[in-house]
UniProtKB/Swiss-Prot annotation:
Name of the molecule in the record: 2-succinyl-6-hydroxy-2,4-cyclohexadiene-1-carboxylate synthase
The keyword Lyase appears for this protein: yes
A biological process term (GO) from this entry: menaquinone biosynthetic process
Reported function: Catalyzes a proton abstraction reaction that results in 2,5-elimination of pyruvate from 2-succinyl-5-enolpyruvyl-6-hydroxy-3-cyclohexene-1-carboxylate (SEPHCHC) and the formation of 2-succinyl-6-hydroxy-2,4-cyclohexadiene-1-carboxylate (SHCHC).
Record lineage: Bacteria, Pseudomonadati, Pseudomonadota, Gammaproteobacteria, Enterobacterales
Length: 258
């Protein structure tokens, strides 16, 4: 079994960019950014429970990571950068910590490396279980209206929030609920130590108004990049700036590729 996705052709010899979306997104999420990086072949994936992979269920991070590995093999992707946002960033970090063959670098936007202590982990598990139940039982428009009122999304304008609610409500609620619990931050190991031992370029991107993940960025041994005029969803709020940031990162590294 492999994940569904969409490819974009690039120039021969350039490494692949493998894009992973956030919770309730799909393979379209990074398309505006990817369109501004035409030299690079790209794979935009639908994660389990999302988009055309909505019928794929996983039990946890190990299974997602194996699915990702199998998918890359199926596309014969031998050298690649992982680029992930939020949930996709957490999956990207977890996968990178498994030392996959062919990984050139890691770019994470607003992804959490993991929780430190058991009380926080328990509280998060309870919160995610409640959200998952809502996704399974309530109209998605109602759930996402509440979801985007969370403090991390405070920088969103009302029109942006309404657009996201309408877009995300096209999902399958049961599939989202299952994926939310399977990949809950409560289930994710604390990846800080493993990420400190990385032997690949690690870049962390966040919006200037995203105070929570700006603080998290300081805890990581990653090169930090602040996106102006953006909050937690920087690649949607300011795609041109995120694309320019990625282009700069990739230009600096392309000369190092054998």
């Amino acid at each position: 079994m492999i994940l569904n996705g969409k490819t974009r052709a690039g120039k021969p010899g350039f490494p692949w960019l493998v894009f992973l979306h956030g919770f309730s997104g799909d393979s379209r999420e990074w398309q505006d950014v990817g369109a501004q990086l035409p030299d690079y072949p790209q794979l935009h994936l639908d994660l389990p429970g999302h988009g055309d992979s909505a019928n794929i269920a996983v039990a946890g991070f190990d299974e997602v990571s194996q699915l990702l590995a199998d998918t890359l093999v199926s596309y014969n992707i031998l050298k690649f950068w992982l680029v992930g946002y939020s949930l996709g960033g957490r999956i990207a970090m977890f996968h990178a910590c498994q030392h996959p063959a062919g990984l050139i670098g890691l770019i994470v936007e607003g992804g959490h490396p993991g929780l430190h202590d058991e009380p926080t982990r328990k509280a998060r598990a309870e919160s995610d279980a409640q959200w998952a139940e809502r996704f399974r039982r309530e109209p998605l428009e109602n759930v996402f209206s509440a979801w985007y009122q969370q403090p991390v999304f405070a920088a969103l304008q009302e029109t942006e929030r309404d657009a996201l609610v309408a877009l995300r409500s096209q999902n399958n609620g049961a599939a989202l609920g299952a994926m939310l619990q399977a990949t809950s931050l409560a289930q994710q190991p604390d990846l800080r130590a493993a990420l400190r031992a990385h032997d690949y370029p690690f870049h962390y991107v966040y919006g200037e108004h995203d105070d929570k993940f700006g603080a998290i960025a300081t805890e990581l041994t990653a090169q930090r990049h602040v996106i102006p005029n953006a909050g937690h969803n920087a690649h949607r709020e300011n795609p041109a700036a995120v694309a320019a940031c990625l282009a700069q990162i990739l230009r600096l590294r392309i000369k190092d590729i054998p």
